[in-house]
């Protein structure tokens, strides 16, 4: 979760984070964040006190909390927790690591804890940690004036700097209301607000001026609870009236009442960026190859540019990256999902052009899509390349021969077009025999894509015939994915058939150009959208049809 603050104040050698309205002050103690409210003369209730941090769990029966509580009792440090029923925060580990020779006051300003207890470590990390561990329980980002408390802390080996993955059931993020502060902390905040000015309130600022927006960046909201001190429990309803400007805390009898907390948890929803444009009315790009070559030369550098160097902070969930950087990262992941080294086999740009990068293949694919008014992100790629023109070293080399760039584009265009036409032919194909026509086995990626395409077509053929159609289409796709010419693929797959429909389709598209608008053939290119969507969905990228 995230909490914004206005400025930092050093008071009694402790760093306080003061809210913009001046009604709340925060400070760290043992890895937990304490919040103190400004006392008001015209308010009959006490200033709200809160403690936000990680609560010990270790499992369903809270074995980690039970172990720490036993160790504290064994060492005579019962003062470190309030009661057996209350939650045990992570600051108890900080007290335990110092063997009780400290007070809460000495733990102030502590965001990172240490533990050398192997029994504690086994609940946090899946492997046995013989040496000590450091637990980064909170972060302060001064440039954003944001306090960040993670759902799971970063755990590091003290000696080897090895970073462990924290067990998911070790901690629970919790926001607790306190009935009072410990004595050492109560003395610390005495007179704190005397030197903190407050802005003049408007007539309608009674509620909003004191509200604290807690931005929840985890999957679920933080737990809420109330922590009572031991003397408060014995009084059975008596509670201490804390006056942060006084040395006394007197118990007074109060009636039961309800009160709204000023800490409002707000779920953070990451922005959804529109990657794919489906606007068929947009202007067509120029058929000139000069601009395409300029982008073709830049796109590899732009997609591989490490934008995280601009902000090396681990914390990026608060939107610290610009929209352009996030879009650039997403486009890089999409191109790798389709044409990357570890991606499944897919349509190529011809056997003589195997050295072009995945980003360049992706650019040519989007160029073909926008020419045929299909969903694409060509304009985004062009804007990114134009935006980073000044950061790319060197000048654009002499343009490659137009025929080379055109040949790559046409090769990819014809492969995509033949893929769609072959799908329609196989859907309408009725095999004369249920026997396998060949012993060749298609690749797993081609078989999966053939299944996807025929599922989209929703054929009602019996399962035995459907299996033959899937195998037939998979063999065709396998040839295309290996950059075999569509005519050669059609010749091989038409052997033994009583129709030359597949071969005729391959011959027809061999004379077509990607740079001419063929309205009749555009419908065949819808098949590639289904395959792209499947690959993006499996890779966790933004899909076209989402």
Swiss-Prot record:
One of its GO terms (cellular component) is viral tegument. It is found in: Virion tegument; Host cytoplasm; Host nucleus. InterPro entries: Herpes_UL21. The keyword Transmembrane helix does not apply. Pfam families: Herpes_UL21. Keywords: Host cytoplasm, Host nucleus, Virion, Virion tegument. Its main location: virion. The keyword Nuclease does not apply. Belongs to the alphaherpesvirinae HHV-1 UL21 protein family. May facilitate the viral transport through neural circuits. This is Tegument protein UL21 homolog.
